[in-house]
Amino acid sequence: MATLKASFLIKTLDSDVTGDFLSDLERRGSGAVHVIMGPMFSGKSTSLLRRIKSEISDGRSVAMLKSSKDTRYAKDSVVTHDGIGFPCWALPDLMSFPEKFGLDAYNKLDVIGIDEAQFFGDLYEFCCKVADDDGKIVIVAGLDGDYLRRSFGAVLDIIPIADSVTKLTARCEVCGHKAFFTLRKNCDTRTELIGGADVYMPVCRKHYITNHIVIKASKKVLEDSDKARAESCVAATI
């Protein structure tokens, strides 16, 4: 009896729900998520812009997004380290984009590019909605790790839902070999510290380790110096 009920349910789903669902999918088209990641100065934004321009050349409607936190080169453009720019929407979050862009205009979009994706806390949710529910192509560019080589934001979280993942490398500023990591030049410990070549540099494994040790040692010296200075000031006032 249970088998008959299950069989009836499957047939019902096949004929009604599944048919409507597949029909809806065909109308919307097939969505996709493509991830471009790597350290700073590895050409992520350049690669993203190249992909976006290719989509435009193929006649697709495109929108570019970036985090409003990134104001290094321009507030309303995605700009590469080489100075190449492309107009974009600068947003504090992603899920509000369809409404801000206008639902009619949003529904006509084929492709959405996202730069500096590590700054968006709702990246996973947005990519699922855009690709799975709305049938659009999402091309995401962002850092895969922070200056401590830990997961940064939600970029790594979207790998399980990605159709493709491209990991780029930079060139080590010390030896010229392939660079997989981002080294912070100063002793600031904030996870989010927006900057360019004045704050960060790409390095290989060897020079990440050696330079990181030096920076940590320098930080300790500064902390000890500040502590000694503070103790000296306290002693002088007693």
From Swiss-Prot:
Induction: Induced by genotoxins such as ultraviolet-C radiation (UV-C), and ZEO and MMC treatments. It is an enzyme of class 2 (transferase). Transmembrane segments: none annotated. Keywords: ATP-binding, Cytoplasm, DNA damage, DNA repair, DNA synthesis, Kinase, Metal-binding, Nucleotide-binding, Transferase, Zinc. Expressed ubiquitously. The keyword Cytoplasm applies. Substrate binds at Y147, T191, E192, L193, I194, G195, Y200. One of its GO terms (molecular function) is metal ion binding. The active site is at E116. ATP binds at residues 38-45, 70-72, 115-118. Pathway: Purine metabolism; Pyrimidine metabolism. SUPFAM superfamilies: Glucocorticoid receptor-like (DNA-binding domain), P-loop containing nucleoside triphosphate hydrolases. One of its GO terms (biological process) is DNA biosynthetic process. Its EC number is 2.7.1.21. It catalyses: thymidine + ATP = dTMP + ADP + H(+). It is found in: Cytoplasm. Disruption phenotype: No visible phenotype. The double mutant tk1a tk1b is seedling lethal. Zn(2+) binds at C172, C175, C204. Monomer and dimer. Dimerization is stimulated by ATP. Belongs to the thymidine kinase family. This is Thymidine kinase a. The gene is TK1A.
